């Protein structure tokens, strides 16, 4: 591995003989937020610098049992709570596709490694954007599965109501194969014919009153979608009736209760600032956020799936202030974690639907042409 890519992989694991199976011999990089027995797993933090898990996360075990070969753990920002991939403790993964620009976060090491051809497959996590955003930044493919479809056991929690584990690769076909292994379901056949696709040029907010960016970037895909038999229509998605950020901060504070504020000095300034804010969230606002989310998740779309860009702003530089760009940078992605829907990133294209099979079928159709 060259020095340029040294911060992508936090540690290399000696190769083992692969088991037979659909992933036989495919090299796998696991985000360092996910436990692997006997392999130091830091969660991107200084606090857990010497942590060695005594169990392997079920999602990882499924991939290994299918023949994947674990070759290392992928770098990430501290506790996966950063959308630009910056990590003051272990270095920041570079973007092989756009040098000098952010890799996105928080599954930054996975996406960068895939873009640099350092592995075949990646296993990441996504709470607000963290598989799809790095995939878009690095020109790779990543699936945020619908909430609950893949086990999150053995993963350090951020916001359990939103946390997901999902596959990353360089092709939709490989992502679909990994998804099949992770869920024990057959991968869907390619399909766009007869589907109604809603074109999103502005995402819904998460109820916080912000003005999300407008982007026409996904319009370049209209011709391809229509050529494959889809009907593309303008679309919008209603917004939750209350601000949902208090829910996010409330659960994040709970996830860190064992170490914050007791060990606050061992956190980076970035995450410490967020956790200090989380301590001040009003309980009434938290309750209102849960009620709003419950009602919002009942929304039934009037299209089969949506298409949007993953990123609605220019790609920030790698040394940007994460706190300044995080809301606009992830605006097209975060709402779908709250809704619990599946989101597939193919470079900067995002396909979204309530069901994993629908976005995978559409992505496979686009990939096969």
Language-model features, listed with the residues they occupy:
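Structural helix-boundary/capping segments
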Residues: 2-4, 65, 115-203, 219-224, ...
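Short pre-catalytic strand/loop immediately N-terminal to key active-site residues, enriched for Gly-Thr
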Residues: 46-54, 91-106
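Acyltransferase
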Residues: 213-235, 257-262, 285-303
């Amino acid at each position: 591995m060259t020095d340029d890519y040294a911060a992508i992989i936090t540690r290399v694991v000696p190769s083992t003989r692969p088991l037979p199976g659909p992933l036989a011999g495919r090299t796998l990089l696991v985000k360092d937020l996910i436990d692997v027995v006997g392999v130091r797993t830091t969660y991107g933090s200084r606090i857990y610098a010497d942590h060695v898990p005594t169990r392997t996360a079920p999602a990882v075990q499924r991939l290994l049992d299918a023949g994947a070969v674990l070759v290392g753990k992928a770098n990430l920002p501290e506790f996966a709570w950063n959308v630009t991939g910056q990590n003051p403790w272990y270095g920041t993964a570079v973007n092989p596709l756009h040098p000098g620009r952010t890799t996105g976060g928080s599954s930054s090491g996975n996406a960068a490694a895939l873009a640099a051809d350092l592995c075949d497959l990646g296993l990441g996590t996504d709470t607000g954007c963290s598989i799809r955003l790095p995939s878009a930044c690095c020109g790779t493919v990543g699936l945020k599965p619908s909430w609950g479809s893949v086990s999150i056991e053995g993963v350090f929690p951020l916001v359990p109501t939103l946390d997901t584990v999902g596959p990353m690769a360089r092709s939709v076909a490989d992502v679909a194969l990994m998804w099949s292994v992770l869920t024990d379901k057959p991968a869907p056949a390619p399909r766009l014919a007869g589907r109604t696709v809603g074109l999103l040029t502005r995402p819904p907010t998460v109820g916080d009153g912000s003005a999300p960016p407008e982007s026409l970037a996904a319009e370049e895909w209209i011709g391809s979608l229509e050529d494959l038999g889809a009907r593309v229509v303008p679309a919008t998605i209603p917004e939750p009736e209350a601000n949902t950020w208090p829910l996010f901060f409330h659960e994040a504070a709970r996830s860190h209760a064992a170490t914050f504020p007791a060990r606050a000095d061992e956190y980076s300034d970035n995450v410490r600032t967020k956790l200090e804010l989380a301590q001040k969230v009003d309980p009434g606002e938290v309750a209102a956020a849960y009620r709003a989310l419950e009602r919002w998740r009942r929304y039934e779309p009037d299209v089969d799936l949506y298409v949007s860009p993953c990123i609605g702003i220019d790609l920030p530089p790698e040394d940007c202030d994460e706190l300044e760009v995080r809301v606009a940078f992830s605006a097209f992605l975060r709402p779908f974690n709250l809704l619990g829907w599946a989101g597939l990133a193919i470079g900067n294209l995002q396909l979204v639907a309530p069901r994993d099979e629908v976005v995978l079928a559409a992505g496979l159709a686009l990939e096969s042409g």
